[in-house]
């Protein structure tokens, strides 16, 4: 529940009810691990064949290269490494407006932030409606953020600074 998966499924279902999106072939792929009982309870709620639970995603390269938008609905995270990974693969990201994700994503610049389900729906719509130039600019900005703040060299410099 803390991961926000139920919220994401609800929002996805609402998106498909909207006239301008109900004809699109939109698939929701949910990666990550959870208890078997939790996954079973989610599966009971789902009537849509376009929602897939992938479990642990071992081949991140293939996964991130197969998606257009990465949605990180978690209510709390330590760092949100998977968000950084998605950004580094050049995937447009949408994440909950909580710390530390809101220090990684600058809303509307290198991704989108949302506070509640209504905003998540709005941000998904906005992301789907971006033209290729707008999307490319956001992805480029995200890659620059990763390089500037989260590259191996930046991590090394931060650790070195902390100890010296």
Describe the role of every protein-language-model region:
Residues 8-12, 28, 120, 159:
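A structural motif in glycosyltransferase catalytic domains
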Residues 1-16, 37:
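A conserved mid-protein helix/loop that constitutes part of the nucleotide-sugar donor-binding site
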Residues 134-149, 157-161:
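A short, well-ordered alpha-helix in the C-terminal region of glycosyltransferases
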Residues 92-95:
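Short hydrophobic beta-strand element within catalytic cores of glycosyltransferases
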Residues 56, 75:
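Aromatic "clamp/platform" in nucleotide-sugar-dependent glycosyltransferases that forms part
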Residues 17-19, 27-50, 54:
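Short, structured helix-loop element that forms part of the nucleotide-activated donor/catalytic region
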Residues 107-108, 112-118, 127-132:
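Conserved acidic donor-binding segment of nucleotide-sugar-dependent glycosyltransferases
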Residues 84, 98-108, 112-113:
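Short acidic/histidine- and often glycine-rich active-site loop of Leloir-type glycosyltransferases
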